[in-house]
Each structure stands twice: as C-alpha cells, then as structure tokens.
Amino acid sequence: MNEFINFDEISRETWQNLYNTSIAPLTHDELESIRSLNDEISLQDVEDVYLPLIHLLRLYKKNLEDMSYSKGLFLQKIVKTPPLIIGISGSVAVGKSTTARLLQLLLSRAFPKLTVDLVTTDGFLYTTDDLKNMGILDRKGFPESYDMEKLTSFLYHVKNGERFEVPIYSHETYDILPNQSQIIDSPDILIVEGINVLQNPQNQLLYISDFYDFSIYVDADEKLIEKWYLERFDSLLKLAKYDQTNFYHQFTKMPEDKVLNLARETWARVNRVNLREYIEPTRNRAEIILHKAENHHIDKIYLKKF
C-alpha cells in the first residue's frame, strides 16, 4: 500500500499561496539565532512554508478551544482548554531543531499573550552511567535508550496543566547535565521535538501520540540526510577543537581520514539503522510532512486527509 495514500501532496508553490498572514516578519539576525549547525533556512522559507503552517496551527488551536467549550456545556461545568501540544519528528541532522525553534518564535508572534514552550526529547535519554549499567551504551539514540515512561508522564502532567521539571541534555558533554532542569509550568502551547516523538512504546496504557494535537515529520532522502550528518559532524569537530570539555574534542586529535571513517561508520551502524527501523516507519503518523531537497529546501508538503 502507498504510504502516502492518506495524504494530500502539495507543492511549495501551491502551499505558499494558501494563506497570507499579518505576522510581523523576522529579521535575518533573528533567523540566524535559531538556525542549527549546517542547517539552511531563509526568510523566503519562512514566508513560503512556515507562515501558512502557522495559520493552520491557528485553526487547530481554535478547534481545541471550541471542543473544550462544547465539552463544558455538555458537562455543565467550566472545562479549561488544555495546552496545544505539537510534536516534531525526523532523523538526526534533518533540521528538526531549527523547525522547532522557528515555530516557537512564530507562534509567540502569532499569540503574543500566550506562553509557548519548547522541549527536546534528548532530556529523556538515560544518563551515560545508566546506559552503561544497562549494557546498552552502544544503543544510545535507539528507543530503549530513552525513559519513555518519564516522557509519557511529562506529557500527561503538561496536558493536565501541572508543573514538570525536564532534565537537560548537553550535546557538548554528550550526557544529561546533573542538577539542572527546565521548568515547564502550564504553557498554552508546547512544542516537543525529537527523533522518538511519534514512537509508541509497547504495553503502555497511554501512547505518546495520544497527547499531540498536531504533529510534524521533517523528511528528506536518506542520502541527503547522511550528507548533512557528515557535514554537521565536521562542524562539531571544529567547534570542539579548543574545548577539552567537549565530547567531540577527543576526535580532533585523530587523522582527518580516520575521523571521516568514524563518522561514516557511526552513521551506518547507528543513525541509518535507527532511521530505517524506528524513525521513518512513524512518518505516516504525522499530520504534516515537510519534505526537503538539496540545501534543506522544502519542495513538497504532505497534509493528512483524515
């Protein structure tokens, strides 16, 4: 069966003409401040792709409010509108983080009186020590390396308007930061970004996908993602060259050809396997798929029909 049978394929040209918005435009500096390493994004991308997406999210927000009001009428009591939770998934190096930060910025502009928070699922990885004790350090990034029960609990508490402390993950130390956390306290909109956002653990009464009001999958050809991964790896090495506390500093002492081989092996052994077996199979669970071509150019949008 065609995986996209339940999606409308929309060209960028058609998509950009679907809605003209009055949201204040971003500056080049604002866009640069949220851009991830080696990700390509332009003000034209914001105008053509993301502003129409913001309008679509407005419709989902309004629908959530209307449903809460109608439920209150039925129950004959006040029903508070729960936060709109948006999930963003996709492979490593595909540009999820940039998309998440951009949406946070644009939604804050679209809803200036509302709180828009952003959380990455990296914070729900087990610590390096825990992974070692569990004997799965070499499986870091795979589903079993995440505390999915804690992630589900977090989403449950947020949906119920309750405060939650989220662990903070550092890409510099490649581990959870001890005694540090991000406080999430009753946001109006929450964006959750990570490779496992659409994955559902087995034997759970509640699935992660149950909590999302809207979900996005950032997609690209596997060969392109590999290219972007290798480019990002190289950029991380350059940043770590003079920082001995950085996880990637250890690789700066190696010959360039050996480092490149290591990066390729890591992609083939970990990231490609993870993409094929666990990440890409969740693609059709998303409400919308943003498809990227060369230079991170979004050329097609797939919107779920029902």
Curated annotation (Swiss-Prot):
Keyword list, A-Z: ATP-binding, Coenzyme A biosynthesis, Cytoplasm, Kinase, Nucleotide-binding, Transferase
Protein name as catalogued: Pantothenate kinase
Organism: Lactococcus lactis subsp. cremoris (strain MG1363)
Reactions that this protein is recorded to catalyse: (R)-pantothenate + ATP = (R)-4'-phosphopantothenate + ADP + H(+)
Any Pfam family hit: PRK
InterPro entries named among the record's database cross-references: P-loop_NTPase, PanK, PRK/URK
Broad EC category: transferase
Lineage top rank: taxon: Bacteria
Gene it is expressed from: coaA
GO biological process: coenzyme A biosynthetic process
